[in-house]
Amino acid sequence: MSVAGELSIGVRVADGEVRAVELASTRPQASRVLAGRTPADVARLVPMLFSLCGHAQQIAASVAIEAAIGEHTPDSERDKRTRRVRLEAIQEHLWRLMLDWPALLSLPPLRDAFARWYRRCAAAREEAEAGCCRQLASELVDYCDRTLLPLPLAQWLELDDDAALLEPAAAREWGPMLQALSAFDA
């Protein structure tokens, strides 16, 4: 358990439907803040109470509220919510890759690139149209191929030897981040 707290969620499913949900939190003060509030207030406040993945937290709260009051959510809305969570996950991964990793490797953070990608993810999340995740992922793969990796991402992901993951491809220059990572392989 971390200082920030822990949330355990148990779900019982029968006949394809959620029959019971059990929550255990080491942060009971959060539930006290929400007690007595309207469902709309709860959905609005939940992302403010937890620092990680605020949009996913809000969606989870909305889903829990809808289940509690017996409201049916159309498939199109569930699909849109899924895309929003995926886009937020992309943003979180980009944060780590472009800001945290360089700092750990004593390299300058990729702030400008991160800001551009963060804005693109945020804009896509607002609309969350079908295909937006696929399009953004394709563009990210292209960015990785051109900027971060010594060979195309698909080939890099197929490597199964730790040393090979850090070897430069014959015709490509290493990016600074991979050069720093290779120093750890000594």
Mark where each language-model region is.
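Active-site bordering "gate/hinge" segments
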Residues: 1-186
